[in-house]
Amino acid sequence: MALYEHVYLARQDISAQQVEALTEQLKSVIESFQGKVTKVEYWGVKSLAYRIKKNRKAHFSLLNIEAPAAALTEMERQMGINEDVLRFMTLRVEEHEQGPSAMMRKRDDDDRGERGERPRGPRPERGERGERGERGPRRPREDNIGEEGLY
C-alpha cells in the first residue's frame, strides 16, 4: 500500500470536537478499504493567506495514511461533498516523517516565551561619522515633463 500525507482545512466556525469527528469519519473511510491512519495532528486554528469561501481562518489537520488508491479516492470524494471542508491536499510520500511534523515543531518553538534582549555587540556611536557638509545647489527643475507623456 502507498503512503500519503493528507492535510485539510475546516471552517473556522465549527468546534474542535467537530473537527475531531470529521477526522474520525475520514479514518473510518480509510479503514473500510483496509488502510490505516498512522498519525493524526491537529494544528489548530490559523489565519489563511487569503479568503477561502468567505473564511479568513481555518482549522488545520494532518493525517499520515497508508492505504490503497481507492481509499483515497473515496475519502477525497466525501471531503468534496462536506461543506465544513474548505480545502484539502493529498501527497504521496516515500516514507512518513518520524516524530512531530514541521508545523508542530514550529508551534513548540513559539511556546518558548519571551527571550529578552539579545546582545548587540560593539557598535560605533552615530556621532563618529562627522558632518555631511554642504550638498550644493539643486539642478533646475524641468517643467515640460507632462508634455513628454511621462506622467
Swiss-Prot record:
The keyword Magnesium does not apply. Residues 94-151 are annotated as: Disordered. Gene3D superfamilies: 3.30.70.60. InterPro entries: Ribosomal_bS6, Ribosomal_bS6_sf, Ribosomal_S6_plastid/chlpt, Transl_elong_EF1B/ribsomal_bS6. Keywords: Ribonucleoprotein, Ribosomal protein, RNA-binding, rRNA-binding. The keyword Ribosomal protein applies. Residues 105-144 have a biased composition (Basic and acidic residues). It holds the Pfam family Ribosomal_S6. One of its GO terms (cellular component) is cytosolic small ribosomal subunit. GO terms for biological process: translation. GO terms for molecular function: small ribosomal subunit rRNA binding; structural constituent of ribosome. HAMAP family: Ribosomal_bS6. Binds together with bS18 to 16S ribosomal RNA. Belongs to the bacterial ribosomal protein bS6 family. This is Small ribosomal subunit protein bS6. It comes from Beijerinckia indica subsp. indica (strain ATCC 9039 / DSM 1715 / NCIMB 8712). The gene is rpsF.
